[in-house]
Amino acid sequence: EFTLGQEINVDIFADVKKVDVTGTSKGKGFQGGVKRWNFRTQDATHGNSLSHRVLGSIGQNQTPGRVFKGKKMAGHLGNERVTVQSLEVVRVDAERKLLLVKGAVPGATGSDVIVKPAVKA
């Protein structure tokens, strides 16, 4: 369909109703469990003086005596490949080389994205 070095315009999306957009999400650095995984916070009062935003218990008992792999904990948030599916194409402006979509496009302003016709539409 395409050859190496061929220029591709937004005209190819003229008859497409929905698209999938892939980009790199904004990096947030090292974040705790409340922001990263939407964990609930602990009591502000009632005897709690130090651990308002900590995870709480992360294991079971003497058996298994360890924390399972994949446990949701604090760590790096964002700066990863994200695909938003089935965004509606509002308008294709060929002369200004613009593709207008309705919805959240992943990544910072001005970052590169990959746009494909929607898989599930």
Curated annotation (Swiss-Prot):
InterPro entries: Ribosomal_uL3, Ribosomal_uL3_bac/org-type, Ribosomal_uL3_CS, Transl_B-barrel_sf. Methylated by PrmB. The keyword Repressor does not apply. The keyword Transcription does not apply. The modification N5-methylglutamine is found at Q62. Gene3D superfamilies: Translation factors. One of its GO terms (cellular component) is cytosolic large ribosomal subunit. One of the primary rRNA binding proteins, it binds directly near the 3'-end of the 23S rRNA, where it nucleates assembly of the 50S subunit. Part of the 50S ribosomal subunit. Forms a cluster with proteins L14 and L19. Belongs to the universal ribosomal protein uL3 family. This is Large ribosomal subunit protein uL3.
